Amino acid sequence: MLDRLYAIRSIGAKALLGALLATTVILAGCGTSSNAGTGGSGSSSLTACQATVANITNTTGNPSQTPTAPSAGVSGSISADGSSALQPLVQAVAAVFDQGNGTHSSINAGGSGKGLTDVNNGAVQIGMSDLYQSAKSISGLTDHQVAVVAFTLVVNNDIASKVQNLTTQQIKDIYAGNVTNWSQIGGPNELVTVVNRPTNSGTRGTFEQYVLGAKNEIPGNTLTQDNTGAVFQAVTSTPGSIGYVSTGFVTSSSASGSPAPICIDGYKADATDINSGNYKFWNIEHAYTKGPATGAPKALLKFLESSAVQTTLLPKLNYYTLTSIAQTAIQSHTSSSDPAPESFYSGS
């Protein structure tokens, strides 16, 4: 009789220990552990962290205010193209600048590679890029670092409640074409559709460098879109899809059924996880000129780097100031082979 009692107690203790361990896996939430959501393919890792529009929104500064551009004594036109992640900010700043100065600005996307090539060839006055010029084997341009952009993976709304977090290894497997159905990593039985960007994209370059570990994307079922907005729309309309966008496209969308942001290794695309070094999918935004900036482009860049813009339009469009990001984090995303940038920040 005593032997049976001891056996029952032993089984009960083991069951309790197992339950506690299972609870620990499920409760490994955002930012609570460097191992949160990693390892294994069970469904618990897919819900170990939840990124929302609210918790990836930059709430600093005065985003409700619109700056006024002082007269800079310049005229004529300003041309820029390149990064579709940086375009919304430069476009918004240029609109205010044009109103105060009578200039005419044309701010287009096309990808960071195009921006660097076009400014180098003299096709535009400003080349917008998420990457350093050396990443595209270009040299001799003058860098102006104007903001920090956070990127996030997003999934179609139909799987948003079941896929909220992916480990780096799971992401690598998806983008290598090894995972083609969400059920392979504990998700729903639904085909994975990868919505990506062309090779000249700075967002893609950032993703490959800081998430895939410098590996190229070779997914199976793929849709390629030319700009960030097109990626956002494609993920919105394609069941089972996943893609990457700058967080401003997520926080500025109020449409029902919009793609949902997800965590990486239990961390989300916000300043806290960027500053801790745990979230690496972000980059410094560059506005390149051919030689030191002059004339109207210089005046526009000075306005962009002014506190009037940095404290209003940056947070409104969900960018971060460089000074709000820890120096250790900035250094981890700085190219040692590129020259120091030209700066128009106050006190510089």
Where are these regions (language model features)?
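Bacterial N-terminal signal peptides that target proteins for export
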Residues: 3-17
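Exported/periplasmic ABC-transporter solute-binding proteins
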Residues: 31-120, 124-125, 129-348
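C-terminal motif of bacterial Sec signal peptides marking the signal peptidase cleavage site
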Residues: 24-29
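N-terminal targeting signals for export/organelle localization
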Residues: 2-3, 38
